[in-house]
Amino acid sequence: MTDFRPADMAAGGKGAPLVPFLDYFLYRDPQFARIAQNIGGIANLTGIPPGASPLQLVAFDTGPGNMVIDAVMEELFQKRFDRDGEVAGSGRVLNAVVAKLLRARFFRQTPPRTAGREEFGREYVGRFLQTCHGASKPDVVATATALTARSIAAALHTFVLPRFAAKAAPARSEQKVCQLIVSGGGTKNATLMAMLRNEVAPLGIDLHFSDEFGLPAEAKEAVAFALLAHETWHRRPSNVPSATGAKRAAILGKISYA
């Protein structure tokens, strides 16, 4: 089975993201509001209000995941990534730089939205390094790491939690009923996880890892496309129009016989 995106695009969608169908399948709950946050090169989320239907999901790219951090590490240390977040953990965040970067148009754009190397690739990293000019190398890595954590928290605060508020039960409105379930390679960065936990705690959000729910952090995409293939085989739609912008549900993928 191949080509899962064209059917959604034919229905007016962007053909992405497709993983929200798995998030809904795994994490929907009648009582808890849950946010599935994947941190790969790009960070993306699926917001699932308590008792939600597929049409009530919100899903979009929050901004850079590991992409900027990895590029900065390669440029400054000739290393592919910041193992365990050790370099970031030894630096200090340039808060003024992060605040300036978060004022960019992308972070203010209302979902659905997608990001890639066009937004956060080499050109962006070059400008980022120039903005951090004069800072120590660990401080620059710490700042790149904070950008990922704070852009996720900002997206939650601005675009996700307001939707959850309307669904929250009055009796539990002051309790921590929102769970952030994190997956992807970013979960291996201890400093990033600590920063993210600190950023979302004031929002009333508890941080969890997908492993706690039976999904290994690095297996999410493989499981997602296995589920999409299963739905295609049974001729059931598996796009999420509220995430992709499609005008209708669609059966995704093509079946090819050898």
Role assignments for model-derived ranges:
Residues 79-81, 85-164, 175-178, 190-205:
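A contiguous, well-structured pocket-lining segment that forms one wall/lid of small-molecule binding clefts
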Residues 113-130, 134, 138, 211-213, ...:
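Glycine/Thr-rich phosphate-binding loops that ligate phosphate moieties of nucleotide
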Residues 15-27, 80-83, 224-239:
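A polyampholytic, Gly/Pro-enriched intrinsically disordered region
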Residues 6-13, 57-59, 135-139, 209-217:
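A short glycine/serine-rich beta->alpha loop
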Residues 165-171:
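Ala/Thr-enriched low-complexity intrinsically disordered regions
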Residues 1-24, 35, 39-108:
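Glycine-rich phosphate-binding loop plus the immediately following alpha-helix
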Residues 49-51, 62, 71, 150-164, ...:
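Catalytic phosphate/nucleotide-handling subdomain of diverse soluble enzymes
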Residues 12-21, 141-151, 221:
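A glycine-rich, Thr/Ser-enriched phosphate-binding loop motif common to dinucleotide/cofactor-binding enzymes
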